[in-house]
Amino acid sequence: MIIIPARLKSSRFENKVLEDIFGLPMVVRCAKNANLVDECVVACDDESIMQTCQKFHIKAVLTSKHHNSGTERCLEAARILGLKNDERVLNLQGDEPFLEKEVILALLEATKNAPFMATCAKVIDEEQAKSPNLVKVVLDSQNNALYFSRSLIPFLRDFDAKRQTPLLGHIGIYGFHNKEILEELCALKPCVLEEIEKLEQLRALYYQKKIAVKIVQSESVGIDTQEDLQNALKIFSPDLLER
C-alpha cells in the first residue's frame, strides 16, 4: 500500500499540493505516479484536498490536522484503512509530482529487504548541496544512513574528497517493512535532532533503527517553495510527465 500524506497549510508554501502541474493538481500527479506501482491512498487534512482527489478518482481519507509529521499521518490512514500488521507501507510525498515510476519500484524492492525501513537518495553536485531545502545523507559501509542534514555533509575539506565520496541528496520517500514498524516508529518520543533539523527521519536514527538507502537515478525535484515550483515548470514538460 502506498500512502501520500498531504497537508494543506504547509509552512513554506500554503496550498502547494493543490497547485496546477500541467493541468492536474500536484497531489493528483503524485497519486497517479504512485498508482502505476501499487494501490495508493492520499491521507489529507482538509476537505478541499479530499474533494480534489475525489474529482480525479483518487482514493483519499481525511486525517487529523494536528500531526507532527507525514509519518504520523500515514499511520492514521493505515489504521483508518484497516491495514494488516504485516502489510508493507510506502510513504510518498504530496510535493514530488515528478517522481519516476522506477524510483518508486526501487524503494519497494529496498523495503522488502530492509529489516526496519528504507529510503532513496541520488548523487548531487556541490551547488545543489548548498540548498537547505535539499536534505543530504551520508551512508555506512552497508548503505544504511548514518545521518541526514540540511547542512553540507560530508564537509569537503580536501579536493580529493569530491572523487572519493559523492554528495547524496535525499529523496523524501520511505518504505516500512510492515505496518508494525510504522506503529513502532510513531510510538517513539521525538528527539532533539529532528526538532533542530526539522527532519522526521532522524528519530529512527536516534533510536538506533536502521534506514536502508537505495541510490537511484532521478531528475525529480521536491516542491518546497513557490520558487521551486516555477523552476520545475521551466525544467519539465507535459510530454515528460505522460506515462
UniProtKB/Swiss-Prot annotation:
Domain of life the protein comes from: Bacteria
GO biological process: CMP-keto-3-deoxy-D-manno-octulosonic acid biosynthetic process; lipopolysaccharide biosynthetic process
Keyword entries, A-Z: Cytoplasm, Lipopolysaccharide biosynthesis, Nucleotidyltransferase, Transferase
GO CC term, one of those recorded: cytosol
Subcellular location: Cytoplasm
UniProt-listed Enzyme Commission number(s): 2.7.7.38
Gene Ontology molecular function terms on file: 3-deoxy-manno-octulosonate cytidylyltransferase activity
Database matches in InterPro entries: Cytidylyl_trans, KdsB, Nucleotide-diphossugar_trans
Reactions this protein catalyses: 3-deoxy-alpha-D-manno-oct-2-ulosonate + CTP = CMP-3-deoxy-beta-D-manno-octulosonate + diphosphate
Biological or metabolic pathway of the protein: Nucleotide-sugar biosynthesis; CMP-3-deoxy-D-manno-octulosonate biosynthesis; CMP-3-deoxy-D-manno-octulosonate from 3-deoxy-D-manno-octulosonate and CTP: step 1/1; Bacterial outer membrane biogenesis; lipopolysaccharide biosynthesis
Pfam families, A to Z: CTP_transf_3
Function, in words: Activates KDO (a required 8-carbon sugar) for incorporation into bacterial lipopolysaccharide in Gram-negative bacteria.
Similarity comment: Belongs to the KdsB family.
Protein name: 3-deoxy-manno-octulosonate cytidylyltransferase
Source species of the chain: Helicobacter pylori (strain ATCC 700392 / 26695)
Gene encoding the protein: kdsB
